[in-house]
């Protein structure tokens, strides 16, 4: 029985054109690029997740109705945040000092649009952004 060498003979290597070597390098680099892209997407996803977790932690610290030593889910944090915002809005709407204040006087927009003399801006609040 004849022993077969696992290494290709030199004559066979000489027959393989140089293009195959370049193609192999190209395929390898394409594969490396694909792996690198995948890793970048994975890292971006992780960064986004860490950012979101950081935001939830910050909300948990800022909203006084969330117990500090109790573990709460993200949904519970959002529910507390919504309730807190609604409470703040209600407090602003019903605050006695704010209710007594007169709204600032300003020229109605209909007068500004119909009267050419009113195009001159007298006050900062009277300016119209789009003309």
From Swiss-Prot:
Keywords: Developmental protein, Nucleus, Repressor, Transcription, Transcription regulation
Role played: Transcriptional regulator (lacking a basic DNA binding domain) which negatively regulates the basic helix-loop-helix (bHLH) transcription factors by forming heterodimers and inhibiting their DNA binding and transcriptional activity. Inhibits the activity of both neurogenic (neurog1/neurogenin, neurod1/neuroD) and myogenic (myod1/myoD) bHLH factors.
Domain bHLH residue range list: 36-88
Subcellular location field: Nucleus
PANTHER family from the UniProt entry: DNA-BINDING PROTEIN INHIBITOR, DNA-BINDING PROTEIN INHIBITOR ID-4
GO biological process per UniProt: negative regulation of transcription by RNA polymerase II
Entry keyword Nucleus: yes
GO molecular function annotations of the record: bHLH transcription factor binding; protein dimerization activity
Gene3D superfamilies: Helix-loop-helix DNA-binding domain
Quaternary state and interactors: Heterodimer with other HLH proteins.
SMART domains associated with the record: HLH (SM00353)
Matching Pfam families: HLH
Gene Ontology CC terms: cytoplasm; nucleus
Name the record gives this protein: DNA-binding protein inhibitor ID-4
């Amino acid at each position: 029985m004849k022993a077969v060498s696992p290494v290709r003979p030199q004559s066979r290597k000489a027959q393989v054109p140089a293009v195959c070597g370049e193609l192999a390098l190209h395929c390898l680099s394409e594969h490396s690029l694909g792996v690198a892209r995948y890793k970048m997407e994975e890292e971006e996803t992780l960064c986004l997740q860490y950012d979101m977790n950081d935001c939830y932690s910050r909300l948990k610290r800022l909203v006084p109705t969330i117990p500090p030593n109790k573990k709460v889910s993200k949904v519970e944090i959002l529910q507390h945040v919504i309730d807190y915002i609604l409470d703040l809005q209600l407090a602003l709407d019903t605050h006695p000092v704010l209710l007594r204040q007169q709204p600032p006087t300003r020229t109605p927009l209909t007068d500004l649009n119909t009267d050419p003399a009113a195009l001159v801006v007298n006050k900062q609040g009277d300016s119209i952004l789009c003309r």
